[in-house]
């Protein structure tokens, strides 16, 4: 047996009890007129974008101000001593400068021209007369210095000052070297291609001649065994 529904009086009473103290919601204006929409006077920024006073413009000014502050801080900061004496090369040319320094260092090692700081700071003899007097005097041991020993002490060979190449000249030389290498590879490829085509042409020609000889037939339409035997004998003689 299905459950019976509650009576209408209980239902109405229940809703009435629940809705006590709650105002009824009304949609729209009570007078029936529509309100006109007006923008919010409390905007997030002043002015308008058309006048150039929008939020993007203010943000740009703030970024410019921060950048100027950073520049002033960098200018006022004292330069460190290490930065004054260390060589700073641009990143895209650093490898060229380092390679040039390494080449000069190796050249000095080979020629034996690396002089110590004491030899460089030592003053040279002022007058030739003083050298003659010292050479005429004999040492207490009775040993006379040889002329070769005197020459080695006085003569100092300095490396030839070669003009350093600029980064543009080095880049130009590198470009020319790469272009020459590419041209040599291209020429070699063309030569191999011509040789391969010539070998294929000769091979096809030889095969066609052999096919013409072996494909000949007699008047009755049978293969000509005499020509085939002659061709085989000729081939054996060539190989032997």
UniProtKB/Swiss-Prot annotation:
Compartments (UniProt record): Nucleus
Q: Cite the InterPro entries for this sequence.
A: Fyv7/TAP26
Return the Low complexity bias intervals.
Answer: 131-149
What is the first-listed, main subcellular location in coarse terms? nucleus
Q: Which GO terms describe its cellular component?
A: nucleus
Which residue intervals make up region (Disordered)? 104-181
Which UniProt keyword terms apply here? Nucleus, Transcription, Transcription regulation
Instruction: Give a yes or no for keyword Transcription regulation in this entry.
Output: yes
Per the record, the domain of life is Eukaryota
List compositional bias (Basic and acidic residues) regions by residue number: 171-181
Tell me, in a sentence or two, what this protein's role is.
Component of the transcription complexes of the pulmonary surfactant-associated protein-B (SFTPB) and -C (SFTPC). Enhances homeobox protein Nkx-2.1-activated SFTPB and SFTPC promoter activities.
PANTHER family hit by this protein:
THYROID TRANSCRIPTION FACTOR 1-ASSOCIATED PROTEIN 26 (PTHR15657:SF1)
Complexes and interactors: Interacts with NKX2-1.
What family is this protein classified in? Belongs to the TAP26 family.
Quote the protein name from its UniProt record.
Answer: Thyroid transcription factor 1-associated protein 26
Q: Taxonomy-wise, where does this protein's organism fall, top ranks first?
A: Eukaryota, Metazoa, Chordata, Craniata, Vertebrata
């Amino acid at each position: 047996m299905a459950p019976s529904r509650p009576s209408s009086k209980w239902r109405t009473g229940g809703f009435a009890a629940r809705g006590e103290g709650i105002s009824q919601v009304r949609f729209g204006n009570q007078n029936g007129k529509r309100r006109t929409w007006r923008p919010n006077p409390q905007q997030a920024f002043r002015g308008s974008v058309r006048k150039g006073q929008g939020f993007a413009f203010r943000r740009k000014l703030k970024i410019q101000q921060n950048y100027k502050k950073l520049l002033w801080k960098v200018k006022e900061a004292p330069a460190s001593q290490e930065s004054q004496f260390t060589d700073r090369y641009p990143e895209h040319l650093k490898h060229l400068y380092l390679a040039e320094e390494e080449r000069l260092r190796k050249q000095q090692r080979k020629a034996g021209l690396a002089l110590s700081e004491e030899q460089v700071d030592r003053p040279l003899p002022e007058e030739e007369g003083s050298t003659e007097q010292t050479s005429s005097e004999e040492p207490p041991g009775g040993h006379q210095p040889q002329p070769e020993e005197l020459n080695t002490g006085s003569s100092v060979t300095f490396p030839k000052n070669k003009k350093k190449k600029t980064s543009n000249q080095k880049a130009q030389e590198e470009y020319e070297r790469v272009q020459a290498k590419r041209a040599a590879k291209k020429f070699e490829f063309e030569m191999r291609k011509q040789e391969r085509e010539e070998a294929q042409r000769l091979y096809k020609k030889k095969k066609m001649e052999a096919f013409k000889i072996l494909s000949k037939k007699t008047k009755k339409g049978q293969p000509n065994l005499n020509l085939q035997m002659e061709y085989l004998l000729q081939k054996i003689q060539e190989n032997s």
